[in-house]
């Protein structure tokens, strides 16, 4: 898949072929290296490539998985689940993973995770977990930046190109239906680009524009991956993000800017 990126040229999105079902303990960087070699038209890797890896396979490889049959839900989780036809055990896992509960009403549970992400269900997810997914859920990786860094270092060692890596996940957005992929971990790029103080196309100085470039790349990759196609990894070629040793924490808005709390 390719799209016109305007003045920056053309952006290509290449989904990797042959990534197998990931299980806990798998050497994910090595598996991704094998998939890169198998994907027609991908090699040689280029300096303007960005590797986007979906959270689910990172979590599975790192054994960030909970067996719901081992969970004893608290009364609050049971009451919420019974009222809104939810699984009390999954609600309990979400509450355990939460730094704080932002909203818990009308069947919706929005929390702040220990990473600082504010999202539905704290990133706890029962989809695409594997053959026994009826009683398993995945958690977000403990340190998504570290996960991205390990993949980046392995790719650099194997292919000799320092390719930035994004770990992506699907988030909702306030006041809009639907989900889109965003970056939850990065290595080798700066997740946001502060354009304040630079002139726009008409010469006016921009005063508030901060570009979420890592989120844009993660969302672009999802166009080639899809939610049910079984393709969890893509190369986004030509996006040209701002390179550097950034952290996903750079993209998290401080609490004092919260207008809805």
Regions found by a protein language model. Name each.
Residues 1-261:
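N-terminal and secondary-structure boundary signal
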